[in-house]
Amino acid sequence: MQVITLQKPSKKITYRTTYILKPSLTEEEITKEIEDYQKLLIDNGAEDIIIENTGKCRLAYLINKQNDGIYFQITYRGANTLVNILQRRMRLSINTLRYQTFKV
């Protein structure tokens, strides 16, 4: 008897991840962080990637002894496993202060 396993096609959902980088980073370091996240998304099958720099803002409370942060938003379409991969990378990054992902 032959066993056939059926895989569900992964549905692409639109997500928006907002993250805050340290304000002490240089332009080159900021660009490298953005490119690393973008490459990670592309390598894992994300589509329609839009990255927005919303600028440097004062934080409501101290995060890792920082008063300010540089805010970015990434909007992308991908499978739900992609969110876990991106958030794991952000959690391990010393330059990312906070991140939050929403379904759009």
From Swiss-Prot:
GO MF: small ribosomal subunit rRNA binding; structural constituent of ribosome
Keywords: Cyanelle, Plastid, Ribonucleoprotein, Ribosomal protein, RNA-binding, rRNA-binding
Tagged with keyword rRNA-binding: yes
One GO BP: translation
PROSITE patterns: RIBOSOMAL_S6 (PS01048)
GO cellular component, one term: cyanelle
Entry annotated with the keyword Iron: no
Superkingdom per UniProt: Eukaryota
Cellular compartment(s): Plastid, Cyanelle
Biological role: Binds together with bS18 to 16S ribosomal RNA.
Family in the record: Belongs to the bacterial ribosomal protein bS6 family.
PANTHER family in alphabetical order: MITOCHONDRIAL 28S RIBOSOMAL PROTEIN S6, SMALL RIBOSOMAL SUBUNIT PROTEIN BS6M
Family annotation (NCBIfam families): S6
Annotated protein name in UniProt: Small ribosomal subunit protein bS6c
